[in-house]
Amino acid sequence: CDCLMECDNNGNNAAATPVAHPVLANVTLVGNNSAAGTRGVRLRAGTEVELYNAIITGKAKCLTVETAETENSFSKQQNPSVLEYISMSTELDSQEGIYTNADFEAGAGNATDYVNTLTDGYVGTIQGGKTLSDSFFTAAAYKGAVSASDDWTAGWTL
């Protein structure tokens, strides 16, 4: 796939259990804008996901959802999957048309108009991320992997 991230459950039986259910927060995913490998995050084959405080850019399709089982996991009736405070540079690509770009944009803090305006290739953060009360997470008030006030990548080169 050459994706920035691909999450699958079972390609032969998308309804198979146990269901793959990654939980990720404070993620920055940057593609190289190549014409090949156009997907950023690919959710498919029945996977569920919780993704919070993320930036996705540099791919023609920043976020693709595939298979009815995966797309239905975002429905208000089931809702085991959550996408909140996600900023990306393209609209969501829905293969089945069940979970649409309008549904994504209606989610808390989601946007499809993110523009990397920095010229040095560094993707900065966007303030106002979700506070996660689960002790598994370290609290952060920003989206992405790097705080503007504490750049742990300072000095890195591309």
Where are these regions (language model features)?
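Extracellular beta-rich repeat passengers
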Residues: C1-L158
